Amino acid sequence: MLFIICLVFISCNVLREVKYQETWCFPAYGMVIGLWLMLSSIPQRRLVLNHTRGMYHFSIQGRTVCQGPMHLVYVRLALSSDAYGGRFFQLVLCGHKLEPLVLVQLSERYEQMEFLGRHLARKLNINYFDYLASSYRHVVRHWPLGASFSPGIVQRKTQVYTKSSVNDLDV
């Protein structure tokens, strides 16, 4: 608020001179202090992707907000439309209990945004999801534990060997 008030004073030439003395430095000083207060009050957010453990860690000002498995963090191509039916796309970093972070603002170019989203997801080694809920363009690198379908992972059959089954193996 101090920043805005001092900016108005400087731009409107208010308090430039009081009783024949130059006083423009007071609003300028107030503007600098207001800007410093505004920037210092923004809390620092930090997202750590630990690929060796398969976990992510999200904190604000050093205090842990949430942590969980990697399959809960992803890059999503989001769709927005205007009143005239125009389609605009943006890339958003999302996750469970994470504040959505817009990585790339609105663009009409679907192919370029999809390429960039896939590239970012590959470099960060996280999942990528298209704007459609069910699409063949999704890239899933991390699956939840105990998922019914997880390509590349074959679930073991828990077979108990009995004496008759062991005898069948004899040649």
UniProtKB/Swiss-Prot annotation:
Keyword line: Cell membrane, Cell projection, Cilium, Flagellum, Membrane, Transmembrane, Transmembrane helix
Q: Name one GO cellular component term.
A: CatSper complex
Cytoplasmic membrane side: 1-2, 41-171
Provide the protein's localization: Cell projection, Cilium, Flagellum membrane
* Database matches in InterPro entries: TMEM249
State a single Pfam family of this protein. TMEM249
Task: Report the transmembrane regions from the record.
Answer: 3-17, 29-40
Predominant localisation class? membrane
Topological type in the membrane = Multi-pass membrane protein
Extracellular membrane side: 18-28
Determine if Coiled coil is one of this entry's keywords. Answer: no
Q: What does the UniProt record say this protein does?
A: Auxiliary component of the CatSper complex, a complex involved in sperm cell hyperactivation.
Q: Spell out the subunit comment.
A: Component of the CatSper complex or CatSpermasome composed of the core pore-forming members CATSPER1, CATSPER2, CATSPER3 and CATSPER4 as well as auxiliary members CATSPERB, CATSPERG2, CATSPERD, CATSPERE, CATSPERZ, C2CD6/CATSPERT, SLCO6C1, TMEM249, TMEM262 and EFCAB9. HSPA1 may be an additional auxiliary complex member. The core complex members CATSPER1, CATSPER2, CATSPER3 and CATSPER4 form a heterotetrameric channel.
Q: What is this protein called?
A: Cation channel sperm-associated auxiliary subunit TMEM249
Species in which this protein is naturally found:
Mus musculus
